[in-house]
């Protein structure tokens, strides 16, 4: 386990029967770019059982956060969903990934398209000051089946718009677009269908995507 660190769980939040988030301590030596993922897991029978998880917390925070689905027969998630405050979580020493700002060409609009727990890397990027310096508009689209699957909705609708640091940037530049497929909601439909029909762009008041202005 030389490539792993042991962190301590400080908070567990169950959004509903299918989704949960974990916060842990963060080793002072851990460095990562917002949007990267780490291998995390548990020691099972003396051996590490690991899976890749995007780091949901921004890189300036003193803790780590991960967002997960509950899979009852999943080798790791069947165990991870029962984790408690004070338990240990294994975290790889060197996060990696390509869903980072360094890999994007300059543009006007940044589209962050996600479904389910694919939201995780964008939770970090949405709180990255450099994102707001580089783009005129940041559009986060989060597609789920039911409204109660919209984890972190309150953060986007209430907390960040009123944040002392990000509030002004967020209100001016950020567009949060949640959409639901299985029940009535203000935005309904699959992300891909909303883009193909043009409804997404009509709703947010921006022109359809083009290669000169838009980055995904």
Where in the sequence are the language-model features?
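A structural signal for isolated positions on well-ordered beta-strands in alpha/beta enzyme cores
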Residues: 65, 90, 111, 139-141, ...
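Ser/Thr-glycine-rich phosphate-binding loops at phosphate-binding pockets of nucleotides
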Residues: 115-120
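Histidine-anchored nucleotide/phosphate-binding helix
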Residues: 121-133
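Short helix-loop-beta connector
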Residues: 104-109, 212-213
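Short, Lys/Arg- and Gly-enriched loop/turn segments at beta-strand edges
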Residues: 46-53, 96-104
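Ferredoxin-reductase
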Residues: 2-85
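Reductase modules of NAD(P)H-dependent flavoproteins
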Residues: 2-3, 141, 148-216
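Generic structural signal for buried aliphatic residues
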Residues: 38, 89-92
């Amino acid at each position: 386990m030389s490539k792993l660190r042991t962190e301590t769980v400080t908070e567990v939040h169950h959004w509903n029967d299918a989704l949960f988030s974990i916060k842990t301590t963060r080793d002072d030596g851990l460095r990562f770019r917002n949007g990267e993922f780490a291998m995390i897991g548990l020691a099972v029978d003396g051996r590490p059982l690991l899976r890749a998880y995007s780091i949901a917390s921004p890189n300036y925070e003193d803790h780590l956060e991960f967002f997960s689905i509950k899979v009852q027969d999943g080798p790791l998630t069947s165990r991870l969903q029962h984790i408690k405050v004070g338990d240990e979580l294994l975290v790889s020493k060197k996060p990696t990934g390509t869903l980072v700002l360094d890999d994007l060409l300059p543009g006007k609009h940044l589209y962050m398209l996600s479904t389910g727990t694919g939201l995780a890397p964008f939770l970090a990027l949405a709180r990255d000051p450099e994102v707001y310096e580089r783009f005129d508009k940041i559009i986060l689209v989060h597609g789920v089946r039911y409204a109660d699957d919209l984890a972190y909705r309150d953060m986007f609708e209430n907390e960040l718009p009123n944040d002392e640091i990000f509030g002004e940037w967020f209100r001016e530049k950020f567009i949060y677009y949640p959409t639901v497929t299985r029940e009535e909601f203000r935005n309904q439909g699959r992300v891909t269908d909303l883009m193909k029909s043009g409804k997404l762009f009509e709703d947010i008041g921006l022109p359809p995507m083009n290669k000169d202005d838009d980055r995904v």
